Amino acid sequence: MTPAARRWPAAGGVVGPVAFAAAWAVLGRRQAGYSPISDAISQLAATDAPTRAGMTAGLALLGTGLPLYAVALRRVVPGPGWAAAATTGACSLAVAALPLPASGDRPAHAVAAVLGYASLAAVPLLAATPFARRMGAGWKAPSRLAGAVCGTCLAATTLGPASGLLQRAGLAVGHGWIAASAVALLRRQDGGSA
């Protein structure tokens, strides 16, 4: 397999999270009455939201990028971390396909979101030791910390009025770890040092 062919799946771990974060950051500023401190990102993709198309596109890019990243992770790093990455990607696509209604809740959306959060926090936790073995010992502690912070922030979204901020913090840490590890995989596949 050529280096370019090995490179593009890992790039999904950068492109997907960056596109998703850009979508919620830009669209959240544009939607009147929306608060990134107290409102969930899913509200930007709700059936009645004027930002629905853009936020759904961001979710779709995340949902396709993460399974590609999972392929690259599986090629280099043993263990179940890749499966957690693929799961969070699939859950992102499910969240996009099951938008919040104009009023009320959508239980299937909530289930997809919770599974997506749990699998996102699991990626760095499950990959910590094998990733450190392959890519350098310096990855182990930060990977565990990223998984713990991601999971804690996302679990804390149920506790109070700053749920939007906690959601963004948890997602930023989890997606940030994925993007950093994807860059390390890209460098390794090109023959560079990790």
Residue ranges of each PLM-predicted region?
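Beta-rich carbohydrate-recognition and catalytic domains
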Residues: 192-194
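Hydrophobic, aromatic-enriched alpha-helical segments typical of multi-pass transmembrane helices
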Residues: 4-40, 44, 48-187
